[in-house]
Amino acid sequence: MLDAFSRVVVNSDAKAAYVGGSDLQALKKFIAGGNKRLDSVNAIVSNASCIVSDAVSGMICENPGLIAPGGNCYTNRRMAACLRDGEIILRYVSYALLAGDPSVLEDRCLNGLKETYIALGVPTNSSVRAVSIMKAAAVAFITNTASQRKMATADGDCSALASEVASYCDRVAAAIS
């Protein structure tokens, strides 16, 4: 995983050049948006339990067979595993948002996730739906449009960060399906 600063250094080093020009401008822009990025990550992590539990509840409401005997969320142990997986996925989405780079999500979370779910018999369509619900909630918290909870956030438009987190959730959904 390379953050924005490390990427610039690695690229400049590969060219045997000093950091300058467009690379410095990109870093200045990254720093200027830093408070918004931190607030966006905080909005997700402060509401992570709510985001994940709502996503799993929504997934189950749409597919009640998941909690019937033989369903993948039947028994407390399986439900706990489902909630745990949702927390892990959302945590790595927040790491990617903080770094401004999806590689931590790809390398440490998504690599092999579909194969693991298939081996365990986890219904991928339900998992994708839960990720979709998490995506909508995370975007709502970042843009401060969540109906039940408003947060103090940095001034300015956070739509780019909302789009960024949405793209990370889309990566998760694509990796699972």
Swiss-Prot record:
This protein's GO CC annotations: chloroplast thylakoid membrane; phycobilisome
Function: Light-harvesting photosynthetic bile pigment-protein from the phycobiliprotein complex.
Keywords, sorted A to Z: Antenna complex, Bile pigment, Chloroplast, Chromophore, Electron transport, Membrane, Methylation, Photosynthesis, Phycobilisome, Plastid, Thylakoid, Transport
Residues that bear N4-methylasparagine: 72
UniProt-annotated location(s): Plastid, Chloroplast thylakoid membrane
Post-translational modification, as annotated: Contains two covalently linked phycoerythrobilin chromophores and one covalently linked phycourobilin chromophore.
Residues that hold phycourobilin according to the record: 50, 61
Binding site for (2R,3E)-phycoerythrobilin 2: 158
Keyword Transferase among record annotations: no
Organism: Pyropia yezoensis
Membrane topology annotation: Peripheral membrane protein
Name by which UniProt lists this protein: R-phycoerythrin beta chain
Residue sites binding (2R,3E)-phycoerythrobilin 1 per the record: 82
Gene Ontology biological-process entries: photosynthesis
Record carries keyword Plastid: yes
Record's subunit section: Heterodimer of an alpha and a beta chain.
Pfam family, one: Phycobilisome
Family, per entry: Belongs to the phycobiliprotein family.
